[in-house]
């Protein structure tokens, strides 16, 4: 009892600080929740109101949404931009990909998916070295997207008629312990059909 009487002031200050921290934390979570709802509404509004006539406005709104660096709606905005072929400017799209990859806080596998999509988006116009550079974070990891990335490289070399390199990548897929089953099947088919001796 004496302890409480003697330290009454310190206990009140300590309790007040703890209460203030709890209220601050809960307030921050509520603000984040409201911001997420706002971004969701903004994205849905862009999708619903999209018309070819207001294409430039849609592009600007989607770019703004990508730059919000939200783990959910920023990638969705970029995918909407690409899927609807709203811009032919590959450089602009690559800048947005880099914004997501380098500046947005993402789950590691979501980040790897975005890297893979960037490589896929660019695969018909870039060099072997550039494609490998984009995909190297995935290829040099245990990502679930590793087999997809190896398959993209194999198909890239196959399309360039660099059959030995293509064969090497198809073989790497087959040897992967956690490779996607469909990709293993396709790789085996390709090896049996086009590379059997």
Residue ranges and their predicted role:
Residues 39-57:
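Short extracytoplasmic/periplasmic juxtamembrane "stem" segments immediately C-terminal to an N-terminal membrane anchor
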Residues 36, 55-56, 90-91, 128, ...:
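TPR-repeat structural position
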Residues 55-105:
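Extracytoplasmic/periplasmic/luminal assembly and interaction segments
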Residues 33, 52, 87-91, 106, ...:
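Short coil/turn and helix-start
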Residues 78, 85, 96-197:
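Soluble extracytoplasmic domains of inner/organellar membrane proteins
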Residues 21-41:
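Transmembrane signal-anchor/signal-peptide helices with a preference for the extracytoplasmic
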Residues 1-20:
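N-terminal positive-inside, membrane-proximal cytosolic segments immediately preceding the first
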């Amino acid at each position: 009892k004496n302890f409480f009487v003697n330290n009454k002031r310190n206990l009140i200050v300590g309790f007040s600080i703890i209460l203030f921290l709890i209220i601050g934390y809960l307030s921050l979570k509520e603000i984040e929740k409201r911001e997420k709802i706002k971004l969701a509404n903004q994205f849905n509004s862009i999708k619903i109101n999209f018309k070819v006539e207001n294409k430039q406005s849609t592009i600007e709104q989607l770019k703004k949404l990508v730059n919000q660096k939200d783990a959910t709606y920023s990638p969705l905005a970029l995918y909407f931009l690409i899927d609807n072929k709203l811009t032919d400017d590959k450089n602009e799209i690559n800048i947005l990909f880099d914004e997501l990859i380098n500046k947005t806080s993402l789950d590691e596998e979501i980040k790897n998916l975005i890297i893979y999509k960037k490589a896929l988006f660019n695969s018909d116009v870039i060099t072997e070295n550039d494609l490998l550079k984009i995909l190297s974070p995935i290829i040099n990891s245990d990502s679930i997207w590793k087999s997809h990335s190896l398959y993209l490289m194999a198909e890239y070399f196959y399309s360039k008629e660099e059959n030995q390199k293509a064969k090497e990548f198809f073989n790497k897929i087959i040897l992967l312990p956690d490779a996607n089953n469909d990709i293993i099947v396709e790789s085996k088919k390709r090896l049996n059909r086009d590379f059997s001796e």
